[in-house]
């Protein structure tokens, strides 16, 4: 037979997960019930649900697109909200995550009572980072930044592996600052900002963009590097972009399969031959063929680079230059609409005309 405490927990879970009419959910009676059950946070009801990746999440008036359950716990701990701490633990949050944001002895004692360790080692802190960053919502990214970017446990120099991970993520796109000259706090901030752009989380992008305007061109840099043509288009059309279009193209070429942003820069007037050269320097065969599709003709210069790098695959491709020709179906469209570009260059349907020619010539 269920105990009163388990019945109470079950009742709260049912209330938090049920779907009711909008009219009743806003009624005074229903709101009173939720408040009495402790299902009220930041001026609104708490809802428990799962996202498309089957991850448990918390929603409320302040976090409408959801928080990963453990991130919600860390926020409740920071706010010293005993009721919500106990509630989120009942729903499956890991009490050890609370040690990241605990700031009073009373709440630390509560965490111990609920089974928390005395402290987290560097590997457990790293596990917290991996867990919370997997959840893709604007609310979650913003709160991760606010809770963790200036957190002593995350800033500790003992967390060598975490620092390596952040540095690795930033190093490939840190073109307008020297990584060794900025604090780890700023690196974490730039990392969370980049995640917002990577997953096109528009609310989070606007949050970081307004708050960190002194991070010169960082949003643009991330949009180019992470193939976010939607955000690139918004910036290029609505804001004054201070970066040269050829420098933008070079950034678009730093990752494989960045077809959408490469195409967009090309349509804005970037030099496709320079993009071809960058692709060969990086040994990105997919980008090389895409540049040829867009009419690039820098075969001789690229061949010299490939020979210097002893890049056998690129050499084989480049010596067949007389077989290739621009793909008129790409060039003639001259589109800059992000949605149309992504449809045109969809990963599952787009095939390079010249790559097919090369493969056909090497079939036998």
Curated annotation (Swiss-Prot):
Query: Which Pfam families does UniProt cross-reference here?
Result: ASFV_360
Instruction: Mention one GO biological process in which this protein takes part, according to its record.
Output: taxis
Q: InterPro entries, from UniProt?
A: ASFV_MGF360
The task this protein performs is described as:
Plays a role in virus cell tropism, and may be required for efficient virus replication in macrophages.
Q: Which family does it belong to?
A: Belongs to the asfivirus MGF 360 family.
Q: Could you tell me what this protein is called?
A: Protein MGF 360-1L
